Amino acid sequence: MTLKFGTDGIRGPVDTVVTAEACLRIGQAVGIVAKEEGWNTVMIGKDTRVSGYMLESALQAGFIASGINVRLLGPIPTPGVAYLSKSFRDHFGVVISASHNSFEDNGIKIFMPNGEKLSKEIEKKVEKILNSNLDSVNSVSIGKASRFDESGARYIEFCKATVPPEISFRSLRIVLDCANGACYKVSPAIFRELGAEVITIGDAPMAITLMITVVRHILKLLSRLY
């Protein structure tokens, strides 16, 4: 299958389109272009879909094989990856997520070091390499992988800093539905640290119930709270 970028990265079912093999190739192809652009390190974030762990491993292998260093962020909202990519010199970002698509799908979205989506020009370069024969770098030049455990904390501080000091959350009681998705940790923390009382719904990373079971029970739960 020929892989091509859509309006928001590459998306599709994980058993036919966004497969482990496809992600290995995507990692290699993007890595080759990234090296040409002078981008040396990729930050990989994801949502809570169960397939994300498989695709993360495949992408990681592809990037390392092309000589790119990898920093694994774990589950984090998509804007968090864009922000962190912009915060570090010569870093770019990849998000493993299909956003509002059903949990059977997954996708790959790429951010340039300026925090913006991959340009059309670079997408075309990647597509050309992606659908050709790919070679790995030698053992001396392969990339290295590490986990970046501060990703959530850094993004939380950034979000808090966007709130004007004259706005107070201390008198607010907020019911927050995280839909068991990528924001299940950072969103409650942001509002609590701003002073609000937070009641969470769907704050467990249960990928199969992502955006499905939460909505059914929200009215019943809210009626108990009020």
Predicted regions and their residues:
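Short, acidic Gly/Pro/Ser/Thr-rich loop/turn segments
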Residues: 12, 33, 101, 181-183
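An N-terminal, well-structured beta->alpha segment
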Residues: 1-66, 92, 145-174
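Glycine-rich, flexible loop/turn motifs
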Residues: 1, 6-10, 14, 72, ...
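N-terminal small/polar loop signature for handling phosphorylated ligands or for N-terminal nucleophile
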Residues: 32, 41-105, 190-226
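Fold-independent oxyanion-binding glycine-rich loops
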Residues: 7-9, 47, 75, 96-99, ...
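Generic secondary-structure boundary signal with a strong preference for alpha-helix termini
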Residues: 18-24, 57, 79, 86, ...
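Gly/Ser/Thr-enriched, mixed-charge loops and adjacent short helices
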Residues: 106-226
